[in-house]
Design a protein with these regions (language model features):
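Non-ligating segments of multi-cofactor redox enzymes
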Residues: 1-178
Length: 178
């Protein structure tokens, strides 16, 4: 199967392919998958598709409507492509999507901690993954440089008014706000 075929099938849902990798035992991918392709949102297409959703399985009245919608659109794509759908919101145990994202080479750790996308900054997310039993060719996204490398001022480090990002004595406690 071609990577472009996966991209096209995922794009029809409003989601986008966010990169792929060939997992090792340390990656915690179940079922002996040879290739994992991450799926998520970057840009407005997912939100437009979610807002327009009205079919069965697109419940917007449940406790987790975006998760329900994601399952409703990604599971059929996985089935059609011969893959298994994995989700970051199912668990415990939870799949290590942040580590998987770093494995694709397409995102970087920002100075404040969250992963940053070279094109969309912090405005991106991972909604699922497609696990394939066969080894597929995936593009090397490692050449995408972090936008933080060329940002000398790093305003993100002191922009948050409550200091929610960065080290604190008790990381579980809410950030203080004066």
């Amino acid at each position: 199967m071609e990577y472009g075929t996966i991209q096209d099938a995922v794009a029809e849902t409003g989601l986008v392919v966010r990169g792929g990798f060939h997992p090792g035992a340390e990656d915690g991918v179940p079922g002996g998958a040879e290739t994992v392709v991450l799926v998520g949102n970057a840009g407005p297409a997912m939100w437009d598709a979610f807002a327009a959703a009205t079919g069965p399985g697109d419940r917007k009245d449940g406790p987790n409507p975006l998760d329900d919608w994601t399952r409703g659109v990604l599971a059929p794509v996985a089935g059609a492509l011969g893959a298994r759908a994995l989700y970051p919101f199912e668990g415990p145990p939870y799949f290590p999507f942040q580590r998987w994202a770093l494995r694709t080479g397409g995102v970087h750790v920002s100075p404040i901690g969250p992963l940053i996308d070279p094109e969309f900054g912090l405005w991106h997310a991972y909604r699922g993954a497609l696990a394939f039993d066969q080894r597929l060719e995936v593009p090397d996204l490692g050449s995408h440089l972090s936008p933080c490398e060329s940002c000398a001022e790093k305003p993100c480090l002191d922009t948050c008014p409550v200091g929610a990002f960065g080290p604190r004595e008790d990381p579980e406690a809410p950030a203080p706000y004066d």
